């Protein structure tokens, strides 16, 4: 498995504004809480980007990421009511 990487400033922003962090995402991945992985629906604007749907604290979050040759780069964490409803 490739290592995960992310922007430290973005992680701090997520902690302060959304009360979630990339560390929590990684923990959820290792706990097999990934519900889906799919290509980003807008490949023109976000070429090569994929999205994790991950359950954290009974809520589904969307985590866009880019799979590089040496790492998986996590872009952001988006809470999703629609995905939460879909997986309940």
Question: Which residues does each PLM region occupy?
Answer:
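Ribonuclease/tRNase effector modules and their secretory precursors
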Residues: 1-88
């Amino acid at each position: 498995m490739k290592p995960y990487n992310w922007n430290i400033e973005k992680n701090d922003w997520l902690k302060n504004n959304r009360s979630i962090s990339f560390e929590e995402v990684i923990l959820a991945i290792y706990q097999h809480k990934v519900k889906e992985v799919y290509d980003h629906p807008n490949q023109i604007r976000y070429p090569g980007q994929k999205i994790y749907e991950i359950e954290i604290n009974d809520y589904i979050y969307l985590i866009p990421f880019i799979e590089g040759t040496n790492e998986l780069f996590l872009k952001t964490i988006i809470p999703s009511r629609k995905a939460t409803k879909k997986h309940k």
